[in-house]
Amino acid sequence: MERRWPLGLGLVLLLCAPLPPGARAKEVTLMDTSKAQGELGWLLDPPKDGWSEQQQILNGTPLYMYQDCPMQGRRDTDHWLRSNWIYRGEEASRVHVELQFTVRDCKSFPGGAGPLGCKETFNLLYMESDQDVGIQLRRPLFQKVTTVAADQSFTIRDLVSGSVKLNVERCSLGRLTRRGLYLAFHNPGACVALVSVRVFYQRCPETLNGLAQFPDTLPGPAGLVEVAGTCLPHARASPRPSGAPRMHCSPDGEWLVPVGRCHCEPGYEEGGSGEACVACPSGSYRMDMDTPHCLTCPQQSTAESEGATICTCESGHYRAPGEGPQVACTGPPSAPRNLSFSASGTQLSLRWEPPADTGGRQDVRYSVRCSQCQGTAQDGGPCQPCGVGVHFSPGARGLTTPAVHVNGLEPYANYTFNVEAQNGVSGLGSSGHASTSVSISMGHAESLSGLSLRLVKKEPRQLELTWAGSRPRSPGANLTYELHVLNQDEERYQMVLEPRVLLTELQPDTTYIVRVRMLTPLGPGPFSPDHEFRTSPPVSRGLTGGEIVAVIFGLLLGAALLLGILVFRSRRAQRQRQQRQRDRATDVDREDKLWLKPYVDLQAYEDPAQGALDFTRELDPAWLMVDTVIGEGEFGEVYRGTLRLPSQDCKTVAIKTLKDTSPGGQWWNFLREATIMGQFSHPHILHLEGVVTKRKPIMIITEFMENGALDAFLREREDQLVPGQLVAMLQGIASGMNYLSNHNYVHRDLAARNILVNQNLCCKVSDFGLTRLLDDFDGTYETQGGKIPIRWTAPEAIAHRIFTTASDVWSFGIVMWEVLSFGDKPYGEMSNQEVMKSIEDGYRLPPPVDCPAPLYELMKNCWAYDRARRPHFQKLQAHLEQLLANPHSLRTIANFDPRMTLRLPSLSGSDGIPYRTVSEWLESIRMKRYILHFHSAGLDTMECVLELTAEDLTQMGITLPGHQKRILCSIQGFKD
């Protein structure tokens, strides 16, 4: 009894100790001896003197346990205790065992040092089995789990004081495969009490995380099990790369490593607990899942229902394009206030105050519209928009300051100015722009004190006079002129509508004083200064002898001049016939060759504007309507506009303007181009409609070319035009240049940028700012300075600044290259110095990709270093016409000669290869489209490409024969 009593007493004491708190995992119990309702009936081996079952009463409930305290002094203690068969089922592959036990301290036995063979540990073992094996112990089949040692052992003193501690041991059994198992406890000599044994497995419980629900999950035998969550109602998976919500169930039944999460849909936000998505209340919105919470509707917007994703603007308020739902709604501004003006001559200043209501925006802008009316505002006469001569400073649109300066107005005319206030939401509603207007009647523009009357013709009883009006009259201006004519005997007044008058019924050989003034609905203007004119003396009835001699001499002189003209025209016709026979000209310009006026420099005129009118047609600005800016020229902006000549239909034109800030000497340079164009008439030369020189801004009006400059047109339509279309365009350019050369003009700036294309793909030569007249067909023009377009200019023109028709032929070859390369820049990124050196060394541009061989041969002929060997434009035109008539000849692709490839001096490869990288090489031969093909094939160095064959290129996906030929020819050039 000595070994039993102390242990039993200890059990009664320790059962009163609290158990440790449960784990977070969900535990499913398979066996728990502490809940047993009767004796456990476990297998004891040996049946006696070993483990024994004990019963204790706790709070009226029996508690069954096992204890073993062997006789001390024996070293061969071998006591076994086996549990009943524990059914595991098919679910859990990993179970846990929890032991509650006490162990007596060996030193607490009588003797102090502990009895012989006393131990303080015992062993836990298990055996798997698909069924109950009965009372057969089968010790060899058990596998050891662990050696169980007590953290706290007790002594007799602990029993007496009631401080015995209960030990708890947990261990796991993994990767179980049978339907059940047995537990066994092997005691090698410890005094131990097995208070309870619990066998269980763990599950990850159902849970919520990140607005996603995760189900109850069984862990795996080892490692983590990934489980996908399900988003709660009105929630969606995050669009971020983390993706849908996921968590990982650990073998211990705990949720670990959350990845991703759900977010509430637009119109919903997380509830206070973060476990549900609730609708945004009315008056608030949530536009996207990136917004953390519902937001209050911005000003002037509302959301009447719950769950709104956007707040709608209230009536009369809007959001400007590009403004998001988070921006407050705003309205258009009210009209400008207190519009006033001050006038000085034909200039006007308008001022106004900002609108009283800006609509809640800061981007208020103003627009000013000008109308010229035949009557006053009270008369209600018809009005039309002001012409191009009216200018607004700083502008008429998008004004940020409430003021504008207007000039270019006409005297004695009625104007109405309308000022509109606009902001970012103007025009979004049904209401129009808020505006205010003012009507103004202009007075006298200026004094006529500087007006000069000029005598046109005089006779004994008539005087024809003309004068320059102070400003051109516009339609509806109702201007008339009143002349005051007097001499010593009479005085008369006469009114005319034009600045020209024929005074009749005058006295012969009499002096008359004449002055003029303008009459308008506002009243008469001031008179001009007095001018004296004298009529011719009366003609006598008979001729004197001297007069008869003069008449005879005049007749003889006229006959001689007529005879000289006839001889000159006969010889000229003979020369023209001989020239046509030599050149076999076919162009339309040969059919009607005109004798053109020789080029006259405007500086030779005392009045250069009058010189320009000798070669051009002066247009009335009232016939023009400016639409939009289409470009910026050397002298000013270029506009698209409309020209309506009297009794003719409207036509679209291009309007080049001379800006007011140009230096004083620039305007005659501007008009010089018009004087040259005015002498040309050819379907492939840009047609001049006329000029405006009598009012600022000075303008040149030409026909409008819908497709703009040739180089930009080709870049936009790369691979859309077939070779036949390109040849037709080149034939047109050659025809125009042939016309110029036959009239002894050298262009000096022939390039694709100076060729214009209309809607029918007809090309016309333009930009004659550098054009000069040669003395004869083979003449030269030498310039003293100025910039030269190196990439398009012949070498002799670069070196000696001497320009001929042959230098234009060289430029035409560059234009051909531009056309066949669809607008590429000649010579790429080479500097001008590198271009000049390469040309002097004999290098020429390589053929463009898929360039027909006959066209490249023409290019090379144009680039002959000796200018005498270059073909004339007539032969170029004829050759291009032959190619158009025989399109099959365009199928042959030009060979790529690597000896003509332009090499940059800065490139220095190895082994005779002038390129550092494969991409540089492919770009130089215009095969850069295949850079990825070479990279994918692993050909990243120039040494790798030297052994390529046609079969290799086919396998790489380069199948076009012309492209294969170009690449292989270049490689062969490296080898040579």
UniProtKB/Swiss-Prot annotation:
Q: Where expressed (tissues)?
A: Overexpressed in several carcinomas.
Entry comment on modification after translation: Phosphorylated. Autophosphorylation is stimulated by its ligand EFNA1.
- Which positions are annotated as binding ATP? 630-638, 656
Which positions does the record annotate as the modified residue Phosphotyrosine? 599, 605, 781, 930
Residue intervals of the Protein kinase domain: 624-884
Q: Give the record's keywords alphabetically.
A: Angiogenesis, ATP-binding, Cell adhesion, Cell membrane, Glycoprotein, Kinase, Membrane, Nucleotide-binding, Phosphoprotein, Receptor, Repeat, Signal, Transferase, Transmembrane, Transmembrane helix, Tyrosine-protein kinase, Ubl conjugation
A GO BP entry is: positive regulation of cell migration
Which residues constitute the signal peptide according to the record?
1-25
Xref: PROSITE patterns? EGF_2, EPH_LBD, FN3, PROTEIN_KINASE_ATP, PROTEIN_KINASE_DOM, PROTEIN_KINASE_TYR, RECEPTOR_TYR_KIN_V_1, RECEPTOR_TYR_KIN_V_2
Instruction: Please give the residues the UniProt entry marks as glycosylated.
Output: 414
Reaction catalysed?
Answer: L-tyrosyl-[protein] + ATP = O-phospho-L-tyrosyl-[protein] + ADP + H(+)
Q: Which GO terms describe its cellular component?
A: plasma membrane; receptor complex
Q: What is its EC number?
A: 2.7.10.1
The Swiss-Prot or TrEMBL record annotates one GO molecular function as:
transmembrane receptor protein tyrosine kinase activity
Matching InterPro entries, A to Z? Eph_TM, EphA1_rcpt_lig-bd, Ephrin_rcpt_lig-bd_dom, Ephrin_rcpt_TKs, FN3_dom, FN3_sf, Galactose-bd-like_sf, Growth_fac_rcpt_cys_sf
Residue ranges, Extracellular side: 26-547
- Report motif location: PDZ-binding: 974-976
Identify the residues that the record assigns to the SAM domain, covering every copy: 913-976
How it assembles, according to the record, is: Homodimer. Forms a signaling complex with LCK; PTK2B/PYK2 and PI3-kinase upon activation by EFNA1; regulates T-lymphocytes migration. Interacts (via SAM domain) with ILK (via ANK repeats); stimulated by EFNA1 but independent of the kinase activity of EPHA1. Interacts (kinase activity-dependent) with PTK2/FAK1.
Q: Give the protein name, as stated in the record.
A: Ephrin type-A receptor 1
Q: What is the lineage of its organism?
A: Eukaryota, Metazoa, Chordata, Craniata, Vertebrata
User: Gene encoding this polypeptide?
Assistant: EPHA1
